[in-house]
Amino acid sequence: MSLSNSLGLLGRKVGMMRLFTDEGDSIPVTVVDVSNNRVTQVKTQENDGYVALQVTFGARKASRVTKPAAGHLAKAGVEAGEIIREFRLTADVAAQYKAGATVPVTAVFAVGQKVDVQGTTIGKGFAGTIKRHHMKSQRASHGNSRSHNVPGSIGMAQDPGRVFPGKRMTGHLGDDTVTTQNLDVIRIDEARQLLMIKGAVPGSAGGFVTVRPAVKVKANNTDVKGAN
C-alpha cells in the first residue's frame, strides 16, 4: 500500500523516552502505540456523500457497547474498540481497504516523515489568571494588601459599563483538544506497532491520540541516523 496524504492512525500515548544517534546526540521521543487499527466502514460518495475510512482502536467489553454500535461492528467483523474516528480520503486510497482490515503502521508512516498529533491536554481544573494566561502578579507590599494574585481592572467606567467579551480571566484550564504540528517520526517498531515521535504530544500517558501526516510540512532538519 502506498503512503496516503490523508489517512492517519489512532493510538495511545505510552510515555516519553530518549534515543541516541551514532554521534551521541540525545533525541527526546514520545512512544505512541498504534497497534490493531481496524477498519469498521469504508464510506463512499455514492452511499454516504463523501469518501472516508472509519477506524477503531483499542478493546472494549461487549457489555459496554450499545446495540446499534454492536450491530455496526458485527457487520464489519471487528471487535469493539474504545474510540472510532474517520479519515477523509480520496476514492483511490479508500478503495485499497475493506471493512475488517487491519491498517499497519508502515502502510501510513515512514521514518523521517512529518506528522500532526491530536490529543486532549491534561486538565488543570479551575485556575487563576497567572497560571492560565501567564499574567504578572502584583506588588507584594508598598500599599498592596489584598491584591497580589488578581488580574486587576477588568473593565472601564460607566462607558461602556461592561466587560468586553474575550477578556482573559480565571476559569477552567486544560482538557482541551490540541494538535501539535510538524513532529518528526524518529523510529518505527514494526513488530510492536509503535511510533516514536520527536518531542512531546498532547495529553497524559495512557491518553488517546490521533496521528496524521503533517498538513503544513516544513523542512526536515532532524538527523535520525542510527537512532537507537
From Swiss-Prot:
Region (Disordered): 135-159
GO cellular component: cytosolic large ribosomal subunit
Modified residue annotations for N5-methylglutamine: 158
Compositional bias of kind Polar residues: 140-150
Family matches, as InterPro entries: Ribosomal_uL3, Ribosomal_uL3_bac/org-type, Ribosomal_uL3_CS, Transl_B-barrel_sf
Domain of life: Bacteria
GO molecular function: rRNA binding; structural constituent of ribosome
Gene Ontology biological process terms in this record: translation
Swiss-Prot/TrEMBL keywords: Methylation, Ribonucleoprotein, Ribosomal protein, RNA-binding, rRNA-binding
Entry comment on modification after translation: Methylated by PrmB.
Gene3D superfamilies: 3.30.160.810, Translation factors
Pfam families: Ribosomal_L3 (PF00297)
Family note: Belongs to the universal ribosomal protein uL3 family.
Function as written in the Swiss-Prot or TrEMBL entry: One of the primary rRNA binding proteins, it binds directly near the 3'-end of the 23S rRNA, where it nucleates assembly of the 50S subunit.
HAMAP family on file: Ribosomal_uL3_B
Assembly, per entry: Part of the 50S ribosomal subunit. Forms a cluster with proteins L14 and L19.
Classification via NCBIfam families: L3_bact
Protein name according to UniProt: Large ribosomal subunit protein uL3
Species name: Albidiferax ferrireducens (strain ATCC BAA-621 / DSM 15236 / T118) (Rhodoferax ferrireducens)
High-level lineage: Bacteria, Pseudomonadati, Pseudomonadota, Betaproteobacteria, Burkholderiales
